[in-house]
Amino acid sequence: MDKIIKSIAQSGAFRAYVLDSTETVALAQEKHNTLSSSTVALGRTLIANQILAANQKGDSKITVKVIGDSSFGHIISVADTKGHVKGYIQNTGVDIKKTATGEVLVGPFMGNGHFVTIIDYGTGNPYTSTTPLITGEIGEDFAYYLTESEQTPSAIGLNVLLDENDKVKVAGGFMVQVLPGASEEEIARYEKRLQEMPAISHLLASKNHVDALLEAIYGDEPYKRLSEEPLSFQCDCSRERFEAALMTLPKADLQAMIDEDKGAEIVCQFCGTKYQFNESDLEAIISDKA
């Protein structure tokens, strides 16, 4: 089961989140049938949103949009504070690798664009923030957002590793944030440790990558695990929700679906679930609109 572990340095100077998001990203790949680069780009976005959602309280919903002018198109993710996340990528078929190493490439082909976050607190006044894409690797772009928009210096590492068949092997990441009151000495010590950390890909390849991430972040410094919470890919779409959407269409459009298509099929963008509405269903909706 996927999870996020929240922790804090005993000194109170820093906190860290580490995530195992393997099942989340694997299910997203399965539902959207993504190729290698699309899988990694979508997966990184889902992990970034899992981190962002873990920072929120109550019943907030968080939308992350990675909008570039590349062949990936838009990447959209929605998460809640209960560990659920869903998402999709417009172009599922991007498959770009280094010829020599087989490394899956994302950043060099993301293009110019923006990292957009929308936090809906349920009050009717969502908070929206937009920052430019810095590298297109998504992790660095997320860190830049946290520093610029939330004024919280943060170190982010996230990635998705694929097997020889381009299926998700492991996915996860971490966030380290400076807390108020941290001394210059403490900040310098952590910056040095982060600079010396192995690459996120190397840590994820460890047998127990969650423990490997924590060890790399804290080293010999004492820390406390605050909580361990489940994570999952979960879509909240339903037939009822799409039926309500059909109710908003003009009667003429609904009648055209009956006359021309003998019904309607609606596919959820976030999870690929198909909902069928036959002629009788559409006639009932028209009747209810009367």
Swiss-Prot record:
Keywords, comma-separated and alphabetical: Chaperone, Cytoplasm, Disulfide bond, Redox-active center, Zinc
Mod. after translation: Under oxidizing conditions two disulfide bonds are formed involving the reactive cysteines. Under reducing conditions zinc is bound to the reactive cysteines and the protein is inactive.
Keyword Chaperone found: yes
A Pfam family it matches: HSP33
GO cellular component terms given for this protein: cytoplasm
Disulfide bonds: C235-C237, C268-C271
Compartments it resides in: Cytoplasm
Keyword presence, Metal-binding: no
MF terms (GO), sorted A to Z: protein folding chaperone; unfolded protein binding
Chief localisation class: cytoplasm
InterPro entries documented for this protein: Heat_shock_Hsp33 (IPR000397), Heat_shock_Hsp33_C (IPR016154), Heat_shock_Hsp33_N (IPR016153)
CDD domains, per database record: Hsp33
Superkingdom, taxonomy of origin: Bacteria
GO BP terms in the entry: protein refolding
PANTHER family from the UniProt entry: 33 KDA CHAPERONIN
Role, per record: Redox regulated molecular chaperone. Protects both thermally unfolding and oxidatively damaged proteins from irreversible aggregation. Plays an important role in the bacterial defense system toward oxidative stress.
Assigned protein family: Belongs to the HSP33 family.
Protein name according to UniProt: 33 kDa chaperonin
Species, as recorded: Streptococcus pyogenes serotype M1
